[in-house]
């Protein structure tokens, strides 16, 4: 999860987030090199006296400053398109969960189970126990098995919402009357925090998302206990 004074991204907990981190570093390096080159050219132009005010045509220079930006954009666009297609793929999910946004809480339905559904509300600050995080904890976490492809169906009951968990590299809009689909694989056990990322009313800041990734045996025990409750 995020820490005070953190400048970088949260630690990746899914293959997609790993790809996004690599793409961020790749793009940042390209932007840094371009900025350095442009700053160097501007500095040279402002300081040198070797200028030709009568120069009207320079096809070689024009060709260079046309081809180089095109190559740079292609180098940035190709990895981006690859990740875009990877994020759109849903290959043989082991578990399907439907997340429904409400004002101002989330509800979850595990479609692989007949009667496994629950609401997830933020725990008020006065009810937090030592070690819990303010404005991020919920009474019912969305539990998923780690290292298992999970499909997430996202919609909303009333207004626009957005289901987002940065560590998993997932952000999907929840729109009333529409069903959006995404997928993720939690590569390690842990608790991953997110929040609604679409302004949805007065209590928009108070509808957090908590995903808990556990081993498959623990998930089966949890689902059995939820069905018996």
Swiss-Prot record:
Membrane topology: Multi-pass membrane protein
Enzyme kind, highest EC tier: translocase
Catalytic activity entry: 4 Fe(II)-[cytochrome c] + O2 + 8 H(+)(in) = 4 Fe(III)-[cytochrome c] + 2 H2O + 4 H(+)(out)
Binding site for Mg(2+): 198
Binding-site residues for Cu cation A1, renumbered to this chain: 161, 196, 200, 207
GO MF term list: copper ion binding; cytochrome-c oxidase activity
Residues in compartment: Mitochondrial matrix: 46-59
Mitochondrial intermembrane side: 1-14, 88-229
Documented EC number(s): 7.1.1.9
TM stretches of this protein: 15-45, 60-87
Described function: Component of the cytochrome c oxidase, the last enzyme in the mitochondrial electron transport chain which drives oxidative phosphorylation. The respiratory chain contains 3 multisubunit complexes succinate dehydrogenase (complex II, CII), ubiquinol-cytochrome c oxidoreductase (cytochrome b-c1 complex, complex III, CIII) and cytochrome c oxidase (complex IV, CIV), that cooperate to transfer electrons derived from NADH and succinate to molecular oxygen, creating an electrochemical gradient over the inner membrane that drives transmembrane transport and the ATP synthase.
Protein name: Cytochrome c oxidase subunit 2
Gene: mt-co2
């Amino acid at each position: 999860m995020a820490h005070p004074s953190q400048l970088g991204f949260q630690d990746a907990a899914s293959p997609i987030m790993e790809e996004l981190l690599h793409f961020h570093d790749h793009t940042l390096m390209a932007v840094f090199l371009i900025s350095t080159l442009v700053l160097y050219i501007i500095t040279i132009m402002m300081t040198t006296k070797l200028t030709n005010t009568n120069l009207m045509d320079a096809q070689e220079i024009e060709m260079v400053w046309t081809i180089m930006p095109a190559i740079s954009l292609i180098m940035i666009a190709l990895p981006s398109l690859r990740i875009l297609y990877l994020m759109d793929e849903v290959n043989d999910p082991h578990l399907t969960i439907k997340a429904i946004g409400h004002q101002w809480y989330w509800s979850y339905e595990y479609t692989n189970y007949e009667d496994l559904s629950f609401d997830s509300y933020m725990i008020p600050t006065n009810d937090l126990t030592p070690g819990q995080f303010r404005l991020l904890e919920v009474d019912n976490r969305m539990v998923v098995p780690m290292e298992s492809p999970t499909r997430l169906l996202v919609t909303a009951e009333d207004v626009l919402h957005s289901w987002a968990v940065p560590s998993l590299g997932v952000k999907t809009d929840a729109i009333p009357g529409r069903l959006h689909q995404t997928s993720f694989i939690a590569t390690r056990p842990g608790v991953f925090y997110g929040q609604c990322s679409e302004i949805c009313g007065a209590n928009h800041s108070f509808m957090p998302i908590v995903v808990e990734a556990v081993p498959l045996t623990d998930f089966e025990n949890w689902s059995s206990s939820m069905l018996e409750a």
